[in-house]
Each structure stands twice: as C-alpha cells, then as structure tokens.
C-alpha cells in the first residue's frame, strides 16, 4: 500500500480493482482540516481518464508490475516498437499509451518496459535524454546568458525553452520529468 500523498506522475496503482497510471497528482490543503489530493488516473486497460480526489492519509494499492530493459526501435504512427535487451523479443505499445513519453524517444534509446500480468503497459524513461535542436531563433547582439531563454523545437517535436547561446543543430540534455533544458551535450 502506498500513501496517496506520495503519488507522483507515472506511478501505477490499483483503484477499484483496475490498474491506473497517475497522470497528475496535486495536493490541496485547507486552512484547518486535512488536505486533499486530486488525481487524474488513466486506465491501463481501457485508456479512459478518471479524476479522483483522496483525503490525505488514505492509502491505495501499488500495482504489481515488473520492469525489463528494452531498446526503442521505431514507430509506425499507431504503435511504438521496443526490443528486450536480454531475449531480443519485440513488443509494441499503442501511441495513446505514450502521452508525454513519445517526445523523448529517439532510435536505440534504452528504456524500462513496464509489464503487468505479462503484458507491456508503459515505459519508464531515463531521467535525462540527449536531443537535437531543429528549430530556434538565431542569436542577436545583446542577448545575455542570464537574460532568460528562447523557444526551441527538438527532433522529436518537443517544444522547450533554451538559453540564447543554443543554436540550431546542437545537441542538448533534457530532463524527461519536466521537459526542461539542462545543459549542452
């Protein structure tokens, strides 16, 4: 059992005898009483999204899942294909299962494939990935390092903010939890 206050985006739980992935978990505290944890849960089986509120202190059942090392191969638009590193078996996941994760997948990236009852249900990305900037504004005289940033589009379609010194074609490190620029690669 896991305390609802410890729920994070990407966690897998069992709620009302069905497995869900936590899409969002926000804590709200009232002036006096106990807090409230508002969550958005996506059913792994049906793909439907539920909004559920829990009282702080409640516990939910953690899903019995297993992780296996895999390599991302390719996607055909509808499915994303992965190969297990130990047995070379190939598995696919529907595109709708990989909401934000698809923006970090590059060919041959190693990920953890998440299995529930012997079937792949999702992936866990590494914390940091290296992506190439394909579109950003050029530098202008007067741009400073401490002066904020500029929008950039990365090779996977992810849009993020980068410092002014980053140029088109450069590789950068991106945090997969937040989508934020970390440093040049």
From Swiss-Prot:
Membrane-spanning intervals of the chain: none
The entry's keywords: Cytoplasm, Elongation factor, Protein biosynthesis
Kinase is among the record's keywords: no
Coiled coil (residue ranges): none
GO BP term, example: peptide biosynthetic process
GO cellular component: cytoplasm
Annotated GO MF terms: translation elongation factor activity
InterPro entries in the record: Elong-fact-P_C (IPR015365), NA-bd_OB-fold (IPR012340), Rib_uL2_dom2 (IPR014722), Transl_elong_fac_P/YeiP (IPR020599), Transl_elong_KOW-like (IPR013185), Transl_elong_P/YeiP_cen (IPR001059), Transl_elong_P/YeiP_CS (IPR013852), Transl_elongation_fac_P (IPR011768)
Annotated pathway: Protein biosynthesis; polypeptide chain elongation
CDD domains reported for this sequence: S1_EF-P_repeat_1 (cd04470), S1_EF-P_repeat_2 (cd05794)
Superkingdom to which the source organism belongs: Bacteria
UniProt record similarity statement: Belongs to the elongation factor P family.
Function: Involved in peptide bond synthesis. Stimulates efficient translation and peptide-bond synthesis on native or reconstituted 70S ribosomes in vitro. Probably functions indirectly by altering the affinity of the ribosome for aminoacyl-tRNA, thus increasing their reactivity as acceptors for peptidyl transferase.
Protein name: Elongation factor P
Species assigned in the record: Petrotoga mobilis (strain DSM 10674 / SJ95)
Gene transcribed to yield this protein: efp
